[in-house]
Curated annotation (Swiss-Prot):
Stretches of the chain forming a coiled coil according to its record: none
Record-given protein name: Cysteate synthase
Modified residues (N6-(pyridoxal phosphate)lysine): 104
Required cofactor names: pyridoxal 5'-phosphate
Protein's job: Specifically catalyzes the beta-elimination of phosphate from L-phosphoserine and the beta-addition of sulfite to the dehydroalanine intermediate to produce L-cysteate.
E.C. designation(s): 2.5.1.76
UniProt cross-references to HAMAP family, sorted A to Z: Cya_synthase
């Protein structure tokens, strides 16, 4: 028995339950339409709780899932009475058990499950770091082959809390290549026989997995928040929060007003911020990310750098920002580092670079008067607990099987 259909957001064409990334008629995103219209929590430890709105048949049993708690110390510091933290990482004292320390693991588990249910044998993806680590771990747990392409800056981020399995195939790129180069190489790899592209923002399972941060918050708080803060590189997390909010609104038990997306990019690489500030649906590279590769090298949170984000596409981040009357911020390295130090000292857990950018955007919003004292606010700390994890686990670096110099390299060199 099916649980959902996939619907094109532009032409309305519907597809059955399958691992599908595109509509045959246009380039719009697909969105899952679930037969369960009300969120019924399952008796599972992690994201499997939200099986109602995950595009898989079998319930996920992973302990990895988001947690939501009401902030006291940071909230007091900022003069906020209803600040909630959505935390995805390792913090066992709060029952946060994501051992790759990033909400990207919330994407990986449903994607690998859907791949398995659809008969796929091997997945191909590009990553700036955190996504690759998450899929490598899921590959280790499931035995499903994962071919992961990362730029040199992301190689050190591909570690695991256990011995890497033979199913993980890491392909690194030499310095000078960035995340977008990795995407281009992965796109070529995915055309080889037997390979299935992970799909990025087009992957419905990936978006739904990230959307569980919003679902968990709504269930914990009892309503949707008024504001949602997150740092974005591709924008998929913001889109996921929006889509989850649409379902929560239709459910009828969590309020009717969509959370305002308040999203941040990290200077100097801020193409979506620039386009949004200019009121444009289209990103113009010569204006919005001039000298992009140099900007990316100078960016503190390098995982937030994508030269081809799903901003303009139907159902993409532009639409999400319009629908929620959203705001975007441009955060400096110094602002991120200050926010990181403040958050860690007050909340008592270490956070990753993108989360520091998100925390900085909240500080900026408070200063600018973009939130009221009593508003219900969700700050998505999308990665943290790395230092805490090292207290409990020995970490193993995943070594590249091959290193290539360009996205145009002969695929024969990869020996796949």
């Amino acid at each position: 028995m099916g649980r959902f259909t996939l619907k094109c957001l532009k032409c309305g064409r519907e597809y059955g339950q399958e691992y599908r990334l595109t509509c045959d008629n246009d380039d719009s995103l697909l969105r899952a339409d679930y037969f369960e219209k009300k969120l019924e929590l399952r008796d599972q430890p992690g994201i499997g709780r939200f099986h109602s709105w995950l595009p898989v048949q079998e319930e996920l049993t992973t302990e990895a899932g988001p947690i939501t708690y009401k902030s006291e110390a940071l909230a007091k510091e900022l003069g906020l009475s209803n600040l909630y933290i959505g935390f995805s990482g390792y913090w066992p004292e709060r029952e946060a058990l994501i051992k790759t320390c990033s909400f990207k693991e919330l994407e990986a588990h449903p994607t690998m499950q859907l791949l398995k249910e659809s008969g796929g044998k091997a997945i191909v993806l590009a990553s700036a770091g955190n996504t690759g680590r998450a899929f490598a771990y899921s590959s280790s747990l499931t035995g499903t082959d994962a071919y992961i392409v990362v730029p040199d800056s992301g190689v050190s981020s591909i570690w695991l809390p256990e011995e890497p399995a033979n199913s993980i195939h890491l392909i690194s790129m030499t310095p000078g290549n960035d995340y977008t180069d990795a995407i281009n190489l992965a796109g070529r790899l995915a055309k080889l026989p037997g390979m299935v592209p992970e799909g990025g923002a087009r992957n419905v399972a990936r978006r739904e997995g990230m959307g569980t941060v919003m679902l968990d918050a709504a269930v914990t708080i009892g309503k949707m928040p008024d504001h949602y803060f997150q740092a974005v590189g591709s924008g998929t997390g913001g889109m996921s929060a929006w889509e989850a909010s649409l379902r929560l609104r239709d459910d009828g038990r969590f309020g009717s007003k969509l959370p305002k997306l308040q999203l941040a990019q990290n200077l100097p690489f801020v193409p979506m911020y620039n386009a949004w500030k200019a009121g444009r649906r289209e990103i113009i590279p010569d204006i919005d990310m001039k000298d992009a590769k140099k900007q990316i090298e100078e960016t503190y949170a390098t995982v937030l750098t994508n030269r081809a984000p799903p901003y303009s596409i139907t159902g993409g981040l532009y639409d999400a920002l319009v629908d929620t009357d959203g705001i975007m911020y441009a955060i400096t390295r110094e602002e991120a580092l200050e926010a990181k130090a403040l958050f860690e000292s007050l909340e008592g857990i270490d956070i990753l670079e993108p989360s520091a950018v998100a925390a900085a955007s909240l500080l900026k919003a408070v200063e600018a008067g973009n939130v009221e004292k009593d508003d219900v606010i969700l700050l998505n700390i999308a990665g943290g607990g790395f230092k805490r994890l090292k207290e409990d686990f020995t970490l193993f670096q995943v070594e590249p099987e091959v290193t290539v110099s360009s996205s145009e390299v002969s695929l024969d060199e990869l020996k796949i």
